[in-house]
Amino acid sequence: MGRGQLEAPQRRRTGRVTRGVAVKGVAVLAVAGLLGAGGAFGAERFRTAGPQPGGTSVTPVGYAVTPAGSQTDLGNLPLNMRLSPDGRMLLVSNNGQGAQSLQVIDPRTSRVTQTLPYPAPAALFVGLAFSPDGRTAYASGGGSELIHRYAVAGGQLTEQAPLKVPVLAPTPVPGTTTPPARTFPAGLDATADGRRLVVANHLADSVTLIDVKSGATSRVPVGHAPLSVVTAEGGRTAYVTNQGADTVSVLDLSGDAATTPAAVATVKVGTHPNAAVLDERGSRLYVANGDSDSVSVLDTGRQRVVGTIDLSPYPNAPVGTTPSGLALSADGRRLFVTNAGNNDVAVVDTTRRRVVGLIPTAWYPTAVVATADRLLIANAKGLGAGPNDGPGYPDPTSRSPRSPAQYVGSMMTGTLSTLGLPLKSAQLARQTRQVAVNNGYDAGADASDKANARANGGRPMPKIKHVIYVVKENRTYDQVLGSLGKGNGDPSLNLFGDESAPNTRGLAKQYVTFDNFYADADVSADGWDWVTQANANLYNQTLWPANYSGRNAPYPSENADPAHAAGVDPKSSYIWQRLANAGKSFRNYGFYVSPKPDNTFHAEDPVLDAQTDPAFMGYDMSCPDSSGTFTPLKATCLSPRVDEWLKEFNGYERSGKLPAMQMVRLPTDHTNNTRAGAPTPQAYVADNDLALGRLVEAVSKSRYWADTAIFVTEDDAQNGPDHVDAHRTLALVISPYTRTGKVDSTFYSTVSMLRTMEDAVGIAPMTQFDAYATPMVAAFGRKKDLRPWTAIRPAAAGNQLNAATAPMAALSATQNSGTADSFNEKLSNEAIWKSIKGADSPMPHPRHQLLKDTSGSAGDDK
């Protein structure tokens, strides 16, 4: 029965998970103070995302966050913790896009006693270890290609000379200079004698063995994207979880330092194993399977799996729990599992191999440590973002170096939750019920469905035969709709008005204004996974911050690497794969494509590529979305994107064979900052806006209009300010049934839009997140209005180019505009602001609303 706690949720005919379960046979009642009046629907109608009073929060998906225990602020994105051998020092590795750091915590008080900063390009990445005597500590350096080494004395760390991890020699290419391939050291562990370190090379599919005295190294291949390492049998064996695959590599380390370790076994576990922990006897290895939502129990004597612990929140639940970290109690009878997707810790009875309770955490727990009397939990995203009233950047006129970043990629502060052990049965039962409430498995089955039906005149969503899914780049709600005159906007933050976005703004006015819609992602790297598979897994979430901060990590998205496919089967994780499996027709225009030598665009995934228009350009700010705007900046630009789409759409108009779903990427609202010779930010947004207007006009004047819905959103909201939350973004739903002119303030997010489209075309939810999400049916009226839309030409459309004297033009010129988010996004935000508001215009001062409660009152630890 899943976690052994939650009974099967009731389901409606579409297969949507609704809110009606029991926990241990006891009905769960919604907490009015947390969820608001009116049950689940009331919560979704009136709450907003981000930090809330009392040390609680709401994630962009809509989950409530009520961390148990007392809370301590950590750094940006804590991903791992390690307890010293004597139990008196806890290390935390903070691996975010902003200031990375290594923190020392006193586990007896949960106080931070030391912080060692690592500003970019210096780096940390996941791995932490102590020598067996506790006198030396180690931290993996990720893109720095080294292991940081520290002397431990008096409860403090003193950094010593690092250990270097050799990069891989490049494959020679005649006539070229190929840089060495990166290893990107991640998880590590010391052997029992303390003489060697075993290091997982995350980007090199290998493990390096380092002699800590001489620095001598040897390397052995393992599986894809190894992440964590556990040594055993006195240092003679190492277990390596291959996060990008579904295996654990078993290494023989019995040779001396000069002997290359041997891979003696490969054990199949679940999909994308994130972490492992060995019991005290060394006979059982527990492995957290990130995209199988399970823990594999491996018999180390026989090197095979002897049991699987299901962590799903209810029977037959889709993926989304995302087990990320493990710890065993001192007596070995309890296994604690951080579930990053569900914001909880599962408490597992290791004898019965079943979940006996759940502990609510802050957002995205990644690591857990158990001492004799305390449970310590690292929460990577803490209480979330909240408003960022400056455009993702501190006030550039301020001389204070302490101004905190207001960029969504780095503004979230991680936290440490501390609870007493052992856990009392009544306490754990209350906490388990709280998790059920937080994540929507509470009483009042079908409450939100019925409320949505009432809002829609008592009818289900009209029959939609064709869906067109348009994804743009990186704008917040306030940037484009803040001055709309309706909805919850802040006019002072509106950068793109009717002069550059008349179609977007006009469609929002005449159809539906969604003023409580959030991007589930932080940036494009996880955004493109969220908009296509309703999730971004731990591989993606741990790597993109290093990629976005110049710390030598790859862009972990928009390719066919199975490591970031957030499903049990990586070949059936994306919406196009689900459509193909269900026999639904689809066509791709720009999603997950890259240019080829013949100047066509193709996807790596053969399922997607087979339905991709090769003449539709991918992301490239040199090429316009629409004709009649700016002149292409390079000769190799193909037909403007919407013009190519129109060519095929007109063919479907003639043939009558329009696919059930079209995916259309229109990226130029990303802009090219103030780069001299490139279009101004207003001109880029105008180009993008005109493309959208022309697409809507074509559909609304076609034979398909009566049963088509166009869904429009941004992949993320990272490039601007918003007075509600840094994740709030644009959403449009355009169909004859949505021309109502009303404001819909229902709590929606990316997965709500995906859920609505899935229902329309007849496929099941991909993950727990779109299964949970409220479909956007309240936006649809009873009657259809077939009046067509006529595209409006923005006044800013045309060859309005940045001059060499444009604000920050020189800095903008140093940035790469050929790939999404491959340049400094904080710089982008500042450049766009100054180009519109004036070179001397200060951005609004940041408002700090990351509300914390360090008293312990946010949770139940009594």
PLM region spans:
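Predominantly soluble domains enriched in secretory-pathway, periplasmic, or organellar proteins
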Residues: 36-452
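N-terminal pro-sequences and low-complexity stem/linker regions of secreted or lumenal proteins
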Residues: 428-862
